[in-house]
From Swiss-Prot:
Origin: domain of life: Eukaryota
This protein's name: Protein SMAX1-LIKE 5
Function: May function in a transcriptional corepressor complex.
Species, as recorded: Arabidopsis thaliana (Mouse-ear cress)
Domain Clp R residues, every copy: 8-199
Amino acid sequence: MRTGGYTIQQTLTTEAASVLKHSLTLARRRGHAQVTPLHVAATLLSSRTSLLRRACIKSHPGFSTNYQFAPSRLQHHHHHNQNHPLQCRALELCFNVALNRLPTVPGPMFHGQPSLANALVAALKRAQAHQRRGCIEQQQQTQTHPQTQQTQLLAVKVELEQLVISILDDPSVSRVMREAGFNSTAVKSCVEDCSVSSVFYGGSAVGVFSSPNSPDQQQQHHNSINRLHHYQNPKDFNFINPNFPLWQTHFLNQSPDQNPLLLSSSASHHHQQQRLREIDLKLVVDVLMRKKTKKKNPVIVGDSISFTEGFVSELMAKLERGEIDQTGELKQTHFVKFHFSPMASKFMRREDVELNIKELRKKVLSLTTSGKNAIIFTGDLKWTVKEITNNNSGGINEISSSYSPLDHLVEEIGKLITECNDDGDDDDCKTRKVWVMGTASFQTYMRCQMRQPSLETLWALHPVSVPSSANLGLSLHATSGHEARNMSTVNATKSLSGYDKAEEEETISHVLSCCPECVTSFDREAKSLKANQDKLLPSWLQSHDADSSSQKDELMGLKRKWNRFCETLHNQTGQLSMMGNYPYGLPYGSSHESSKSTSLIDSLGLKPNQRATNSIAKFRRQNSCTIEFDLGGNEHEKGESINEAEDDKGNETVTLDLGRSLFRSDSVTDTRLKLSALVKALEESIPRQTVTMRLIAESLMDCVSKKKDSWIIIEGRDTTAKRRVARTVSESVFGSFESLVHIDLKKKGNESKASPATLLAYELKNPEKVVFLIEDIDLADSRFLKLLADRFEDKRRIKTGIDHRQAIFILTKEDSRNVRNRDSVLQIGLEITAQSPGKKRKPESDLSIENGFWMKKEVCSRQSSFNSSYLDLNIKAEDEEVEGEISPISSDLTGEEETEFSSSSNFLNRIQNRFVLNRSCEPGIEKGMITAAFREIFPEREEGGGVRFSVEDKLVEELYGIQNGAFERWLKEVFQTGLLTVKKGGKKDTGVIRMVFGGIVDNKGYGGGVGGYMATFLPNKVQVSKFE
């Protein structure tokens, strides 16, 4: 039986165990569930004197082959090989990117310590096997008596150099090193050389060099032999057990004094971490206390979810204790948590969203009315972003639906922040503030920028970058002090981790080092900025001081923006770093070149033209985070990428505006993307009509792409599906439900003050893009049709291009067999058949055949008697006259109107896009609701007794699409009331009750007043008929 007690103590030396300890800390800080060889390799590279780092430098082609790592020569070599720190920095960045790609576990779900990955267990076993084989050979060479040799199994402690070699054998580590320009085989050879040379220059292979009086080689060899541990029983030997909890406690309880790997820098590293944490906290407070800008809501952006959550928790604690409140303005500030899981937020109903917003508003207002400040903490912003899926065209698109709870939540939170911070001129309101704060990874924040409109605009967010580690927190760039173009050569010898913020800001803000093209664009934007500022105030209130602080800050921001944009865009081909052919394309700067940063556009899978639409995102620890990109796709606001303008002298110049697309978008690809998004939205909204939805989407997008009006006619009995089509099109094509104009010609203006023709004329003059849903177009009058015909025939708007507004017209027609007057209702009856004791129960199909037409006959008789006495003016008369022929008894005016009506209605026949949407006959939820309501009155019995109940399929079809709220109330107030009457009047609780459809009749003949139940076509009562 394995004891497992010596799992770590008997397999790893102190140095190797210390490396795994720090790897565990790194994995836990990043929120990873397992410790992989990538964590170990990143930890080994974190020390400047580590064995792996020295081996990487030695394996580089530019390294001198005659050089040995003597302690006295190490510093001298560092100054004469400037490219080696850059190469190691690049390698650290590659490992950091690889770690960012590993899956993370959310904070609430992350319990306990990370476990050992299978790849790391295999690496430890390889290291143990190599170490044991080497020690056996050494022992055999030192033994003088062969007969004393033992064949027992030896368990040895794994040295650090063997651990490094085994880690380099891992495929994932080798792949990352190859991407950074290193050869793992060459590095392994250098590790072996370094371990041998350390015998002559020091007693350690980890960079901690000993004095000249260090033991000789024979003494060290003797010490290595004494490290061997013999077991009496070979079964007692134990390999690495990843599930054994002792290794975790061993790492966590190990003191810093037992860490020779980072012994020289452990105290300073801890102090540096504390100092950086204080700087990060101060950056967040500075964002909260901003006064000259609207972006006062910080979002903590980091590479680890657990780390950012811990950072916010520390910020909450310090704010409550008042430890970081310097000016007193953040006193009595309380956090209000308001966040959801990504899955829960996607499937919320409108009622749930409104309830949550109401509770949030109540909490915030209770704090502000009592003179306190509030910070709405939204947690990880991943729940605010829609899911992005790949479509068939190779691009990406967001999932659209008829109602988006995410958009609703985001908009309501933005409105709440604006209302609370803009509370009028009340003096008490000026001291009350409401902020919103969240956390996000770099990928999540980029997706928040890709929203339309972006979350940064809606919530006035300002990102603050908080890397999880000082050494490995490279974010997306190598932090360097070489930001200006012509820095002195003294700066080249500075540490790459050192950073002079004031010097960089001074250089970037005051020196405009751009190409002529970008300088022209800067001048143009600066002029427009000054012009906009002059328009805000009258002349007697404008500041005549050219060096005013606000204007100076704006100009400095423009210079900084254009410097970085020009440096990123135009100088990538001319400025090559000493990296050589670095696969990632990340230049890291030198004494004469400026460092650059890369964005996360590649990781999101965007196309080149989509990448160019966004300028580079720069996350820096020292100056919080500056996001300088615009991921908006509004082509009407941004126009083309290259714009022609005229300067003051009248010369025509070509300028490149920041934030606009650098390449002309492919119209075909863009149309395909929009078409796929619209098809997906329509199929999700009306899943039973997938083929028709695709045809509708294709016809609409064909006209939209040509910047023409879209005209379609939808016939059929599925009124609900027609309305869903209009709502989905308005949201997917024009981006909002507010662009939908609904005109129901059956109402004839009774419910609304304005007539349909007046409403249509007003909306046609609206400059905004509109989707018209016109129901029952066959009931339109001549004036209404004249307006539509004039719009349909108007071609000047397309030719001249004066009016770029587009409109989509969705015209619907009801089936002639299903045309319902607004005063018509369904007639529903209950057929009750008592079960005779001596007869068998008949099948329900026989009952429907024999007794299913009683109500229809009654309806027909009522209709015939009603029609014989009255003339229903609501019934559309059939056109029996010959088309174009005028009645001889009509006046000339009547003839002209009829001729005009005929000519205006002819345009309907010219609309080619026609579709039919009929309701399916599948029983829906209405039948289940009816059965459930029936069983509340007549419960089922186990022994075959009780009342049998069925619903006619025709009735289920007619009830399809009724509003659930009205239908539920009808079931309780009308249907169940009728059932109680049947139950009280029945002699026995047996028999068959069938709910049948009795046709559609006029409500006047039905005797029910104006309209059916709650203005629906449901009857106010259910007729009951008994059959013996």
